[in-house]
Swiss-Prot record:
One of its GO terms (biological process) is adaptive immune response. Residues 50-56 are annotated as: Complementarity-determining-2. It holds the Pfam family V-set. Residues 1-23 are annotated as: Framework-1. Gene3D superfamilies: Immunoglobulins (2.60.40.10). InterPro entries: Ig-like_dom, Ig-like_dom_sf, Ig-like_fold, Ig_sub, Ig_sub2, Ig_V-set, IgV_Light_Chain. This is Ig kappa chain V region BS-5. Residues 24-34 are annotated as: Complementarity-determining-1. The lineage of its organism: Eukaryota, Metazoa, Chordata, Craniata, Vertebrata. One of its GO terms (cellular component) is immunoglobulin complex. It comes from Oryctolagus cuniculus.
Length: 108
């Protein structure tokens, strides 16, 4: 089964800053990678699918890139509302697996 390794576990940046979250798959998953945002008491929100396709209504400040085994989520022009935990989700023929999550703290 594919294993998704997500880094860092936590990151803190000021309002207006940029956060980069990385996700590495143990084997190629092509572009079968999604990113989710989760806030307490709310269901996970899909941000990006197929590695780089922005879900409808998601601001372009969120950018996904990568293919194969290495993927990145970049959040630019950080806003207080971006404070959340972010997860990658990789899929292959065995099913889907989530990364361990990254807590984003926005200062300001």
């Amino acid at each position: 089964d594919v294993v998704m390794t997500q880094t860092p576990a936590s990151v803190s940046e000021p309002v207006g800053g940029t956060v980069t979250i990385k996700c590495q798959a143990s084997q190629s998953i092509y572009s079968n990678l999604a990113w989710y945002q989760z806030k307490p008491g709310q269901p996970p929100k899909l941000l990006i699918y197929k590695a780089s396709t922005l879900e409808s209504g998601v601001p372009s400040r969120f950018k996904g890139s990568g293919s194969g085994t290495d993927f990145t989520l970049t959040i630019s022009d950080l806003e207080c509302a971006d404070a959340a935990t972010y997860f990658c989700q990789g899929s292959b023929y065995t099913g889907t697996v989530f990364g361990g999550g990254t807590e984003v703290v926005v200062k300001g």
